[in-house]
């Protein structure tokens, strides 16, 4: 499948593997004559069994994300799943935010985008001068993400990524529930339109948001306006609320 809602062509390949056994099934991916390392597919943990989950969020191509994921994976060892409550990337309709810099960026470019880090093929130099690669997680265990405000693009157009894009990929609503061993995961779409709470009289100098509270209301949350809102309603009677109850 070619995903057109990106700033460059992105292709998605999907395969279904059944009959997985407890010992796991080794696999590799071959594309354009290049073969990946060997990874492992395992069946879902049995209901009620103990599991080890890695919870992370707000990656957004930050300088130390690769180091954090590499060190966390080394410290906790093998996990059964990765849970991400939002903000996987910075700008969702930039392919580079998901897959890494364009090849034209050169061999020395920093690689600290979402998938390279979660696949252990990043190249991100931390403040200590050491280069970190992240960890090979999503090739071996499932990823359960939630949509954060950074996954919601602000402009709908022929080449922009939107909530519809995620539905096209998964075929599902942006909220879901799943059982992982002895854990019941309930994921809602409650991403919030973020706004700052600073006050600046000059609109051109407002770095975080063009909209702001009145000076007299900044210290009183009860008087704040509606510039900060949840993208998908969870009010009583809404589709998401009906599903949850």
Protein language model annotation of sequence segments:
Residues 45, 57, 86, 147, ...:
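Residues at the C-termini of beta-strands that transition into short coil/loop
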Residues 1-55, 60, 77:
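Acidic, histidine-bearing metal-coordination/catalytic regions of metal-dependent phosphoesterases
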Residues 49-141:
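Conserved, compact domain cores that house catalytic/ligand-binding motifs in diverse enzymes
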Residues 44, 62, 91, 152-153, ...:
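Active-site loop signature of alpha/beta-hydrolase-fold enzymes
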Residues 16, 24-40, 98-243:
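Extended active-site neighborhood of metal-dependent phosphoesterases/phosphodiesterases
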Residues 12, 67-71, 243:
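Well-ordered alpha-helical segments embedded in enzymatic catalytic cores
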